[in-house]
Regions:
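Positively charged, solvent-exposed patches that mediate nucleic-acid binding
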Residues: 1-116
Length: 116
């Protein structure tokens, strides 16, 4: 990911859950909050309730969806993407549409492809 680093610390996830804006749809919940850095940071959460490791890894294709659309998403935000149980039956295109829809509702999508 060219413009993004990852969120790994538990307290960073909790801060986004409590203080960030959120948007939910059938497959995902996306939390976002402006950060002070010029880079975006992203974290992914897939619960054990979703399924065994193979299913959870299949849902983690969200990383690739984000990577492909990274230039369309505004920079300087912390994002957490939480997969819902229904995501295990979704195909790649449904997850992509759900992610982009949530980002659009949060006002994260930009017109150009430079991400500024």
């Amino acid at each position: 990911m060219e413009f993004t680093s990852t969120i790994k610390q538990n307290y960073e996830f909790r801060r986004l859950y409590s203080k960030g804006k959120s948007c939910a749809n059938a497959y995902l919940v996306v939390y976002c909050r402006k950060n002070r850095a010029g880079r975006s940071r992203i974290g992914y959460t897939v619960s054990n309730k979703v399924g065994h490791a193979v299913v959870r890894n299949r849902i983690r294709r969200l990383r690739e969806i984000y990577r492909l659309h990274e230039r369309q998403i505004a920079r300087g935000y912390d994002l957490v993407v939480v997969s819902r149980v229904r995501a295990r039956t979704a195909d790649y295109h449904q997850l992509e549409a759900a992610f982009l829809s949530a980002c659009a509702q949060l006002g994260l999508l930009t017109e150009g492809d430079d991400g500024v």
